[in-house]
Amino acid sequence: MKIPSLYFFFFIQIAIILTIAAPSDDEPCKNGYLIEMSNHIECKCNNDYVLTNRYECEPKNKCTSLEDTNKPCADYARCLEDPYKDNKSNFYCLCNRGYIQYEDKCIQAECNYKECGEGKCVWDGIHEDGAFCSCNIGKVINPEDNNKCTKDGDTKCTLECAQGKKCIKHDVYYMCGNDNSGSGSGGGGGGGNSPPPSSGNSTLSLFNALNIVFLIAVIYII
């Protein structure tokens, strides 16, 4: 293989890692902590923070004044002003582009009408079947029930925790913490929860590991 080709693959691999790789020790889930369900990993926000995407939490705004406009006011939602209602300014939360309101929360538009049972719908833009179900820990996909989370089963934790931490089941998801972490509330991608004691923020996907090995090999050859 020619040297220019090696450099080309080198930079392509770096681009892939930076754009689609899940968070790791070098990409923390700021203002929250990583959780894992059966088919995906995402952030769960601390109190008074909300999700702006699967891996970012920002401060929650009350959405009561002009200062709050265009700022996060709920998971996947921003504050807007309606100056024409009742002849005075009114403020409301509107789901971000790509999300729609379902009951009292914003969900990905691709998940509209997608029933998952004991889990949640996820769309990552990569899964070949489009929107899919990610189950609460203790449940797995049931092929005989439209791939809903209605079958009992085990899911192996793939979170790589920081030194001194271990992967534990906390309510209906996995996280990094101590064995004596109390039971939490909610599961999946909701915000508004404080992290249990000693929660960790790191994960290392198999994809990242393989790319690191590839990069080391390329550098050695060069």
From Swiss-Prot:
Residues 201-222 form a propeptide. GO terms for cellular component: plasma membrane; side of membrane. Gene3D superfamilies: Plasmodium vivax P25 domain. A lipid is attached at G200 (GPI-anchor amidated glycine). PROSITE patterns: EGF_2. Its main location: membrane. SMART domains: EGF. Residues 29-58, 59-107, 107-150, 151-176 form the EGF-like domain. Keywords: Cell membrane, Disulfide bond, EGF-like domain, Glycoprotein, GPI-anchor, Lipoprotein, Malaria, Membrane, Repeat, Signal. Disulfide bonds join C63-C79, C73-C93, C95-C106, C111-C121, C116-C133, C135-C149. Glycans are attached at N87. It is found in: Cell membrane. It is a lipid-anchor; GPI-anchor. Residues 1-21 form the signal peptide. This is 28 kDa ookinete surface antigen. The lineage of its organism: Eukaryota, Sar, Alveolata, Apicomplexa, Aconoidasida.
